[in-house]
């Protein structure tokens, strides 16, 4: 067990394991060595617990890029810090510094995780079948040459809805465990026609890993 895996083991409350099941498939697509950009959809703060599970099962730390405010969220922030996360200040100059830190991590053969949607979608964007992504993942892939490994997850919003202050776990909320599902796909074949075209390919690969029902309720507030 690596130091990072040990920290995450400590952070993941054992009682939660009675009420959450992680169904993760596609780990054969997750490279065991070399630089990797891991890109997936974003539905809940509980998504970061899923990434912690990927670290535990995949055996590789994930340097998660996330908006700097998340590093101050209880438990979630501790997970981000434990994984050596890269805080992103959306102010232009500081965002460039975060991007540079991600390049350095990839050049060192590390895994950098990103959620190209940038934030948990609201309203119709949360429920809709089409995921819209920003171009950061594509630009990072072009600059580093690292492969983009897509993942799709669902069920996290049931455990930690956007409007909730924390995860809804335990007999007060559920009579039986809730299953969170994750599907990891093969490297995205980027068309190379620029960041916009590459982003479209990345988002399509993520959507292909999701079931048709995953964008449905519960619906966050507008």
Predicted regions and their residues:
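Non-catalytic C-terminal accessory region of glycerolipid acyltransferases
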Residues: 3-4, 96-222
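A secondary-structure boundary/capping signal
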Residues: 26, 41, 66-67, 115-117, ...
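Short acidic/polar alpha-helix capping motifs at helix-coil junctions
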Residues: 1, 13-18, 40-43, 64-68, ...
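Short, basic, glycine/proline-bearing loop/turn elements
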Residues: 12, 82-89, 119-124
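Catalytic core of membrane glycerolipid acyltransferases/transacylases, capturing the structured
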Residues: 18, 32-92
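A transmembrane-helix-recognition feature enriched in membrane-embedded lipid enzymes
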Residues: 1-26, 50, 74-83
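Residue-level signal for beta-strand positions within conserved beta-sheet cores that form or flank
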Residues: 20, 60, 178-180
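Glycine-rich helix-loop-beta junction characteristic of Rossmann-like nucleotide cofactor-binding loops
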Residues: 27-31
